[in-house]
């Protein structure tokens, strides 16, 4: 059987934060400030525009979409076509926020650059931020070198965080949260 590649979309500037949710492929295109959804037939829609660049995506148990707003270091919620601030991450993030993973309980784990890469600042460690529904943001893990590519294993017991500037992955065993 011959397989052929088919372009479903072009013109993207920087695709980020890919997630599969309810039979659609969602992702941020952060330089165009848009969040897209692509269906199984190759049709796509702009879901929302985020003024300060979208990055990581996830969902609360009730279906509310969560979006990391990079430049202003905020966690946003998007439901019923309303984009709102859910949490201000700026006190815990050293620079722009980026990737995120959300567990089945709605706990969001959010990475950040830790330093201003564009100004040539020295590489330095930062925090992985945790936002639980209805609570203030807190530090889930510290001393990480640009936490990114975070995933939770299928059984929900292990959080794996890629550290871009350390060239390693950090594994954290999580207790089951209710």
Enumerate the language-model features and the residues they cover.
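Short loop/turn segments that connect beta-strands within beta-propeller blades
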Residues: 39-42, 79-82, 132-135
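Beta-rich, blade/repeat-based domains predominating
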Residues: 9-22, 50-69, 74, 91-115, ...
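Beta-propeller domains
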Residues: 29-39
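A short beta-strand motif characteristic of beta-propeller blades
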Residues: 4-8, 43-48, 84-89, 136-141
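Conserved small/polar residues in nucleotide/adenosyl-binding loops
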Residues: 171-178
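Blade/loop signatures of beta-propeller domains
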Residues: 1-3, 122
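A short loop-to-beta-strand structural motif that recurs across blades of beta-propeller domains
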Residues: 34-36, 74-76, 127-129, 168-170
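Short, solvent-exposed loop/turn segments at conserved positions within beta-propeller repeat blades
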Residues: 31, 71, 118-125, 164-165
